[in-house]
A protein has these predicted regions:
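Structural signature of extracellular appendage/secretion-system components
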Residues: 1-241
Length: 241
């Protein structure tokens, strides 16, 4: 209401800048946490593949010993240790076979080890957001993403829950707060006066990004690789978010 009060204007602008930087820093921290999740998932997938390959190899050795009529106690202990280490990364179920081998499945039923063969997991980008990670398997020459519900328990399950629930909720809450506050502040700013002669309504002080509709990577594309269709979104009332 007193645009000529320059000292007050500078205080308000400084505090507004500080607030904007705080929102930006919070968003950057969420991005950093997400990058850490991706890196940890990649390491976990490599560890799982190493362990499942080890189980398949020991299965082969056990089958040979059992076939000769002997009991491979040391090999059984070695396999039990590998399964225990695997369980630290993902919840698994096991099924023994008559030949002494052990089949290993993730809790959702995906086969990891069957006899002397292991199925490798792979790190993949999320279908809707390439900055997020997902777990996949090779299926008929293509990567098939596993639902996170199949990977309950263990380090991988915890990382996926943190990514898909905690970080997603935190990012959404931060966006809602920023949009609602910016809208209200700009509305209040418009009720004031600027330094023009004659004075006019105050200009918006804050700006925030428009909402983004993320397309599935499997959506139809044209010959140039661009999505055929798109969706745009706007915020009609930020306070209702």
């Amino acid at each position: 209401s007193r645009p000529q009060d320059l000292s007050t204007r500078q205080v308000v602008l400084a505090r507004a800048q500080d607030l904007a930087q705080r929102y930006a820093a919070a968003g950057a921290q969420i991005d950093t946490l997400q990058e850490g999740v991706v890196q940890d998932l990649q390491v976990a997938v490599a560890s799982v593949n190493r362990l499942t390959q080890g189980i398949a190899t020991v299965n082969e050795q056990i089958a040979r010993v059992v076939g000769s009529g002997q009991t491979p106690n040391d090999l059984l202990d070695q396999r039990d240790q590998l399964v225990a280490e695997l369980s630290e990364f993902v919840q698994v179920t096991t099924l023994p076979a008559d030949d002494g081998t052990l089949a290993v499945f993730v809790a959702g039923g995906q086969r990891l080890v069957l006899g002397t063969q292991s199925t490798a997991l792979a790190f993949a980008s999320d279908e809707f957001d390439i900055t997020r990670g997902a777990i996949a398997v090779q299926d008929s020459g293509t990567l098939r993403t596993l639902p996170s519900s199949m990977l309950a328990g263990g380090r991988i399950g915890g990382l996926l829950r943190f990514q898909n629930e905690d970080l997603t909720d935190a990012r959404a809450a931060l966006g809602r707060m920023a949009a609602a506050f910016s809208t209200r502040a700009n509305e209040q700013q418009a009720l004031g006066l600027d330094l023009r002669a004659p004075p006019g309504a105050g200009a918006p002080m804050f700006a925030f990004g428009a909402p983004l509709a993320l397309a599935s990577q499997s959506n139809a594309r044209d010959v140039a690789g661009n999505f055929i269709g798109s969706v745009t979104m706007t915020i009609a009332d930020a306070t209702a978010l």
